[in-house]
């Protein structure tokens, strides 16, 4: 079968690989759609970050080259021995976290903080940029009736956003800022609306993405290339209760902090390619808080329920659909060159 595999920086190859077979406790899926994620783009431009290269990942037991793709959905085609609660033909979304189940974080149920954290399609395993995938049954979530396959491919990134907002201290009626209106930033805007934020101020240089943010319910969308974003946010709010950093751009982190009020909170959502710095006194003198957030835990059912209510709409977020053979040029390179894109979905080969 065809699969898109990471061999190195700017080296994604579509090649033939063996079709996977499910072992006991595993599920085989005919992939439908897979989204290209910001994390995939980081691996393409500056990897390896999550991709194991020197030695096999302790849970996937794989190393590069690996089949990419972790934002995916499809249809169950085969069940390994012992799998219950699923049936052939079920439409499913995949929660792609590798977790050991034995470290202190896993014992607390915080499997996204596992000492050996990994992701199908980043750390090995049968990623979604392929015709078929095989994953452990615990990663498989049956989709509600009426949810489209394109919508299913957005469950994973929407889970990132919803987890970040849940982890924050935002309360109904509070104010928020979102720095960066890529796919995750826009999904954070939607999650903030669900949480009852009274004002949501988005900072984003792309005009198309700013308009998307407004369409999704942002109060304002600020162009940082022509406006002092921090000053504008502080003028409107006196400082927001919570700011979300969703750019991975070093100079933006201190802006997020300075956009918050006293005792404000900054959530760092991005995966970073380089170091960032800030003046600690900006945190100390206002008793502000910094909070990291990674992936999600126990939120897939909530995300899919919200989708049935019209939230996290694929129609509003997907800007391009491509074939797997075009993944490098029309997918990764397009995301680098054209900041008007939000979410690009890759259709699985037959």
Describe the residue ranges of each PLM region.
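N-terminal Rossmann-fold NAD(P) dinucleotide-binding loop
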Residues: 185-186
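Adenosine-nucleotide cofactor-binding segment
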Residues: 175-181, 193-255
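Glycine-centered, small-residue-biased loops immediately flanking beta-strands
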Residues: 174, 264-265
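C-terminal hydrophobic helical "lid"/dimerization subdomain
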Residues: 250, 254-258, 297-350
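NAD(P)H dinucleotide-binding glycine-rich loop of Rossmann-like/cofactor-binding domains
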Residues: 56-70, 98-179
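Rossmann-fold NAD(P)-binding glycine/threonine-rich loop
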Residues: 270-286
């Amino acid at each position: 079968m065809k699969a898109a595999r990471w061999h190195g920086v700017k080296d994604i190859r579509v090649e033939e690989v063996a079709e996977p077979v499910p072992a006991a406790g595993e599920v085989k899926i005919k992939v439908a759609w897979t989204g290209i994620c910001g994390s995939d783009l980081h691996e393409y431009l500056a990897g390896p970050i999550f991709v194991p290269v020197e030695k096999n990942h302790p849970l996937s037991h794989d190393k590069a080259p690996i089949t990419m793709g972790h934002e995916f959905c499809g249809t169950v085609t085969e069940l390994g021995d012992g799998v219950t609660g699923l049936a052939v033909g079920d439409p499913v979304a995949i929660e792609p976290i590798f977790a050991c189940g034995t470290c202190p974080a896993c014992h607390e149920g915080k499997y996204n903080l596992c000492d050996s954290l990994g992701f199908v399609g980043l750390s090995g395993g049968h990623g979604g940029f392929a015709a078929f995938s095989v994953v452990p049954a615990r990663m498989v979530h049956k989709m509600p009736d009426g949810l489209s396959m394109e919508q299913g491919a957005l469950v994973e990134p929407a889970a990132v956003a919803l987890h970040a907002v849940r982890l924050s201290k935002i309360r109904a009626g509070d104010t928020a800022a979102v720095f960066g209106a890529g796919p995750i930033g826009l999904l954070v805007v939607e999650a903030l609306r669900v949480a009852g934020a009274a004002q949501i101020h988005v900072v984003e240089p792309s005009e198309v993405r700013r308009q998307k943010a407004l369409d999704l319910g942002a109060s304002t969308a600020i162009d940082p290339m022509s406006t002092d974003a921090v000053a504008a946010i502080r003028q409107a709010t006196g400082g927001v209760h919570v700011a979300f950093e969703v750019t991975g751009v070093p100079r933006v982190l201190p802006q997020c902090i300075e956009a918050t009020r006293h005792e404000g909170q900054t959530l760092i959502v991005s995966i970073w390619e380089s170091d960032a710095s800030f003046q600690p006194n900006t945190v100390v003198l206002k008793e502000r808080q910094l909070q990291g957030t990674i992936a999600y835990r126990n939120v897939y059912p909530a995300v899919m329920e919200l989708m049935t209510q019209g939230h996290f709409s694929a129609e509003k977020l997907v800007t391009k659909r491509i074939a797997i053979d075009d993944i490098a040029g029309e997918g990764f390179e397009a995301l680098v060159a054209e900041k008007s894109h939000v979410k690009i979905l890759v259709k699985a080969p037959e």
